[in-house]
Amino acid sequence: TNTLSLEDHVSVIEEISIKHPSLCISFTIGNGKTPLDANIQAYQARKNEKFLVKKFQIYGEVNNILENSSLNDKKVKILHIDINDSSGFGNHLSPYETTIKVMKSYVLLMDKFLEKNSLTFFLGGDNFMIIAADLLEKDEISALLNSISYELDIKFNCGIGLGRTSRDSAKNATEALDFIRKLRKKGQNIPIYEIK
């Protein structure tokens, strides 16, 4: 999803090494039909010390690098989610209790979306980003979010972004979420919006 070749990964590590010589980093490359598949492949390559470039500690499977992937032309789907009116929690919850509610949301998002081979990340505050399986449709996303909303008595806003790269998709997802927020300020409630 980052569309970087193996050579691109090497040049990134070289540049970081020049700017920050005391920093030691490594990359693990994996891809698959779903984000979870890619994560598992990357994990296995790292665990089994399958180096693509040992000098720079780049791990992966030769047949998984971008140039050989049949997955190159697929679009990446990313969701940018926030909790609607989480600042309003302060009217009846302490900051600690608010944090618990946000963390419970995170755990449930991870659990529900992992069942759909998608990976959830906490961005801070009340924001989450999900690298979604491309087969996950808007209606299914809505149903998953509604089930969590019901369980925790909260509401989510969800921007869905599609793009050729993860950067494009994340940008589109954030723009979609910003659009939802603008509409909310005008009194319109659209909890999910998608930009392709």
Locations of the language-model features?
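Regulatory and interdomain segments flanking nucleotide-handling catalytic cores
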Residues: 1-196
